[in-house]
């Protein structure tokens, strides 16, 4: 517990909250070839590697991921949600923030149904999260 005098001399320092998705908070100035502080909700990027990785201890699966080089020259690992995907190397994707708890180092999600990423096939519920169009009614 500080004394009144210590608080007058120094004061309280606010804690600075660290971003959960730091690559979305950087832009790139191609003329100056330098990074700028421009935050955005999503960013575009090009897949440099597409593969699978195994999750942390209690879980077991082959989770699909893509290594993405963003427009701000930062390379990040992004999760590919949903069943099945059409991504390859050099596919152009849109990423958003949001980590995957059981994959270490994966802090971003790829947006399904945007740019080169197709929506999930035959999905009926929660379609908006997976970029699936409304199915045609058969009468």
UniProtKB/Swiss-Prot annotation:
Q: Name one GO cellular component term.
A: small ribosomal subunit
Q: Which CDD domains match?
A: Ribosomal_S12
Summarizing the function annotation, the protein's role is: With S4 and S5 plays an important role in translational accuracy. Interacts with and stabilizes bases of the 16S rRNA that are involved in tRNA selection in the A site and with the mRNA backbone. Located at the interface of the 30S and 50S subunits, it traverses the body of the 30S subunit contacting proteins on the other side and probably holding the rRNA structure together. The combined cluster of proteins S8, S12 and S17 appears to hold together the shoulder and platform of the 30S subunit.
Species in which this protein is naturally found: Shouchella clausii (strain KSM-K16)
**This protein's record includes keyword RNA-binding:** yes
- Keyword list, A-Z: Methylation, Ribonucleoprotein, Ribosomal protein, RNA-binding, rRNA-binding, tRNA-binding
Q: List the PANTHER family.
A: 30S RIBOSOMAL PROTEIN S12 FAMILY MEMBER
What spans are recorded as compositionally biased (Polar residues)?
27-42
Gene name in the database record: rpsL
Its GO biological process terms? translation
What's the protein called, per UniProt?
Answer: Small ribosomal subunit protein uS12
Entry superkingdom:
Bacteria
